[in-house]
């Protein structure tokens, strides 16, 4: 892919997204955005419908999780048995304030890991997290994947971690660390997929679906792969 074919950053509005797709002559759209990026997914569905563009949703895998540890909302932490626990929040920056407040209501001592961006650090401050309570790093950074996260858990004597059921590298990292170090893992349940959008769950399924669309044949995206 050439650099001039790559768009980096958010689209300021649905209209700008629509204009961009029309300007570059897009004929097929694959939505491979984060499962919690609800706004862009909804805008893609709307724009593709208006422009009569085929839309495929690439769904990330589900890592095994105990249903009892799934949270519908971060506010549900307030009702969890966390009194005296040391909790590490590894959720989106915009959810930090609500998650930290709920965890404190449950009696937990709260720490957080955030991305090294000005917005994330600002949200951490609004959540009352700074100094020794806060780690600023990218998931999986360092010489050994998960090494920094494991060191944080040891330093803070973490008993519980909250992450998002994203299906990505961070989700897998926390799933593995929690099993290895006997940490209780809570996951914020991923949003339900948008209706009326075909979904695939592997690269093989995606390739077959794209080939089928190009050749004018209908391929079931929910089989194989």
Task: Kindly give the residue locations of the regions a language model identified.
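Glycine-rich, highly charged phosphate/nucleotide-binding loops
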Residues: 4-24, 134-148
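Active-site glycine-rich loop that binds ribose-phosphate moieties when present
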Residues: 66-82, 91-97, 143-146
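N-terminal beta-loop-helix "entrance" segment that forms/cooperates
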Residues: 1-11, 69, 120-127
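C-terminal functional extensions of proteins
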Residues: 156, 160, 164-168, 185-225
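A short helix->loop->beta-strand "cap" motif at the edges of active sites that frequently abuts
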Residues: 49-56, 108, 180-184
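Structural motif
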Residues: 27-28, 86, 159-160
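Conserved mixed alpha/beta catalytic, RNA-binding, or beta-rich assembly cores of soluble enzyme
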Residues: 61, 86-143, 151-154, 164-165
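Glycine/small-residue-rich loop that forms an oxyanion/phosphate-binding "nest" at active or ligand-binding sites
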Residues: 19-77
